[in-house]
A protein has these predicted regions:
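PLP-dependent amino-acid enzyme catalytic core
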Residues: 1-100
Length: 100
């Protein structure tokens, strides 16, 4: 199962790498000391949309775009909606995002 998961992650990364930013890792001395392990923070706030949601939304919309959907519809109270709007714009997908 581990091997399949790792392979799926590699495939997703290859799929989305052209539309997402490669964000840095930052070593956290305080968290590392507290946990007695090396802890790094992934700075996804540097992503185009300001959160990690761009990765999952881009991957899903790229997969869906292969099926030529008429419209993508989603609901979000924040980051997911921004990520879907970003990816849909790049992929030229008709999208409706409901913000409650």
């Amino acid at each position: 199962m581990k091997d399949n998961f790792y392979k799926d992650v590699e495939i997703a990364l290859e799929r989305i790498q052209k539309i997402i930013r490669r964000t840095p890792l930052q070593f956290s001395p305080s968290l590392s000391e507290e946990s007695e392990a090396e802890v790094f923070l992934k700075l996804e706030n540097y992503q185009v949309t300001g959160s990690f949601k761009a990765r999952g939304a881009s991957n899903k919309l790229m997969l869906l775009s292969e099926e030529n959907p008429k419209k993508i519809i989603t609901a979000s109270s924040g980051n997911h909606g921004s990520a879907v709007a970003y990816a849909a714009g790049i992929l030229n997908l008709d999208t409706l995002i409901f913000l409650p």
